[in-house]
Amino acid sequence: MDLKDYVRIFDTTLRDGEQCPGAAMTENEKLEIASQLATMKVDIIEAGFPVSSPVQFQAVERIARETEGPMIAALARAMKADIEAASKALQPAKKRRIHTFIASSPIHMKYKLGKEPKEVLKMAVEAVTLCRQFVDDVEFSPEDATRSEPEFLRELCEAVIAAGATTINIPDTVGYTTPAEYGGLFKFLLSNVRGAEKIIFSAHCHNDLGLATANSLAAVQNGARQIECTINGIGERAGNTAMEEVVMAMRTRKDTFGIQTQIKTEEIARASYLVKTITGMLVQPNKAIVGANAFAHESGIHQDGVIKHRETYEIMKPETVGLSSNRMVLGRHSGRAGFKDRIVKLGFSPQVEELEAAYQRFLEIADRKKEIYDEDIRALFSEEARKSTGDRFQLEGFTVSTGTKSTPTAGVRILIDGHVREESATGDGPVDAIYKAIQKTTGMDPEVSRLVISPVTEGQDAMAEASVTLEYKGDRVVGKGSSTDIIEACSRAYISALNRL
């Protein structure tokens, strides 16, 4: 495909996205997301920042070894140790990219680096030159580019192109720019940088002013041929450009943009749900493309129009992002075949053991809930699929007693390394009581830093999904649990998190 009529998608969910508070992921979780990104046909996956910690290094190395299809990138400051660590971590990958950066704005050079522009220019050239000794594909980012002097930015870009950079990324590091300014900056650079026609210019935007998507699209309209983004727009502060938004904007408004990505858009909903489940970062209902209300129509006038002709109020079909236009309803009389068929249609590839465990949970839920929808099935299957045969703790049962004039008391029965243990405790509410009982049973007392309970579907018998973030001895993990019983959902989430510590 000609690079000039194709926008590369550079996904940084595993690097920039993970910098969002509370979004830390385990190595296995990162690999799971990387696999989904590969299924979506993402062009480049930024797997992490190898020099920052042994855990980061191992995660990048494993993704490089086990993820087929996309190019795997690793971040490195313009420093020899960073670049060497990135190169080593990327070694198993078939397609490798080192992404090196250094600040270029006056405020960053003066107060963060304590360097003069000439020194920064020299460091950038040396970094790119060193990168090219290890890989053929090198990306360079002048950090805080949108607050940099345009002429210095031009000089810096020319120098790193001459040194061997194949992609130059123009980051709006603090989310300060506007579409007109950002588009104008790309137009200036592509028109004035010697060698610009030989490389790819990339957009990397943050959402501090709510303009990340608009800015990225303005860059594309002015020559950018790569967008750096994350699933659900997660990232530091207000987040990054949301992949689903820029991809669907270019697809839906191809008349305006005249250019496409190669993303398999039918995988967007599954990717969104996966990232939400793993990180515990909920998606707002009115979030474009992947929010629960994105394709909902409550107004009678709108409903009437959609029934008569979908395009009256729908500019894209839910099926294009992997959502079913018709919600399938299952119940207690649904068999394994129907259940498996629905799981597959929701985008999962179940193993025999996962399917059986999920089906047994489905039957339990069906005894309490008359109608089970796609959202319910997705929640319970995701929970079962995340379990491991090596999990130390399994919730066997619990009891709770509470009331307005009684002390909340909970008892739990937990299978620990094959042996059943029971304990009880009191607490400030039923959830606190059951968490304290679990702590007594397991001998672990992590701090609950975050607990979010949200309905999966509507109605009195709706499934609830709980997400709990635990902190223990320097580690932070997220656990998820679902049930029609809120206390059970919270208990399952807590046990799920403990198994990740």
Curated annotation (Swiss-Prot):
It comes from Leptospira interrogans serogroup Icterohaemorrhagiae serovar Lai (strain 56601). One of its GO terms (cellular component) is cytoplasm. It is found in: Cytoplasm. It comes from the Bacteria. Pathway: Amino-acid biosynthesis; L-leucine biosynthesis; L-leucine from 3-methyl-2-oxobutanoate: step 1/4. Coiled coil: none annotated. Mn(2+) binds at residues 16, 204, 206, 240. This is 2-isopropylmalate synthase 1. GO terms for biological process: L-leucine biosynthetic process. Belongs to the alpha-IPM synthase/homocitrate synthase family. LeuA type 1 subfamily. The gene is leuA1. Homodimer. Keywords: Amino-acid biosynthesis, Branched-chain amino acid biosynthesis, Cytoplasm, Leucine biosynthesis, Manganese, Metal-binding, Transferase. One of its GO terms (molecular function) is 2-isopropylmalate synthase activity. Its cofactor is Mn(2+). Residues 394-501 are annotated as: Regulatory domain.
